[in-house]
């Protein structure tokens, strides 16, 4: 067993016996029914070597982790023009806060809070149309994984999010009054809810993340998926904003760019080294996976992969 493999097996055992597990997202009915004891982890290296443990092959709702992918598509489509409609700064507020929008005239602080991701969804609907945007999203993701047909959108989750997503409706309509939502609000939100209802496993999520690990290339084919500059921008935003008002604590504890979702998933990237996905559905007070964060903290402690180390990629896992 390789060192990384033995490390994540040890981590999974620690998480299995943890007494504090967090709380599932009970405001989205399908997520409220997920077993709190689920735990999976996957690590994919630059050479394609893959290590998985626990429920790493079980599909789950990636929710806000999907914002990394929609942002990648929007940056490919618009480039820096995008930053006229959404900023690049941490919010320091809850992911669904409306307060800052009023103070900042309908321009969201960053593309990972809900308001910012809704603007990104609006951009993609403008470019591709509501239905075709969903197809384009799947076409963007599927070439990056070894079993592409199993990445899909759970339409039941999307429907129930639409039926209960009153705060997101308020955010979209409020931004519409400032001209920052340019399509029919219902069309933009329909794509946004379907985007968040993406399902994939930890293994697949780690595979998708490899295009950020490699600076924008598909490691399976060598094809460039995005520019190196865009990949660096996304990683910087993941570090600053990927865990909402818990982003600073995550940066200190883990020290890797990461993006969480209320489905309990986290995608973390060690640039040039590894793409890591972890899933544990219990959330902390900020809406981030409690045990997922702890598992990544343990991984970095063992491997030395924090970007804040003096020589982060020199230390070998021990």
UniProtKB/Swiss-Prot annotation:
GO MF annotation, one: glutaminase activity
Gene (UniProt): glsA
Major enzyme class: hydrolase
Protein name (record): Glutaminase
Similarity comment: family membership: Belongs to the glutaminase family.
Reactions listed under catalytic activity: L-glutamine + H2O = L-glutamate + NH4(+)
InterPro entries cross-referenced by the UniProt entry: Beta-lactam/transpept-like, Glutaminase
Residues holding substrate: 64, 114, 161, 168, 192, 244, 262
Keyword Disulfide bond included in the entry's annotation: no
EC number, as in UniProt: 3.5.1.2
Annotated source species: Gluconobacter oxydans (strain 621H)
Any one biological process term the GO annotation gives: glutamate biosynthetic process
Matches recorded under NCBIfam families: Gln_ase, PRK00971.1-2
Keywords, ordered alphabetically: Hydrolase
Subunit field text: Homotetramer.
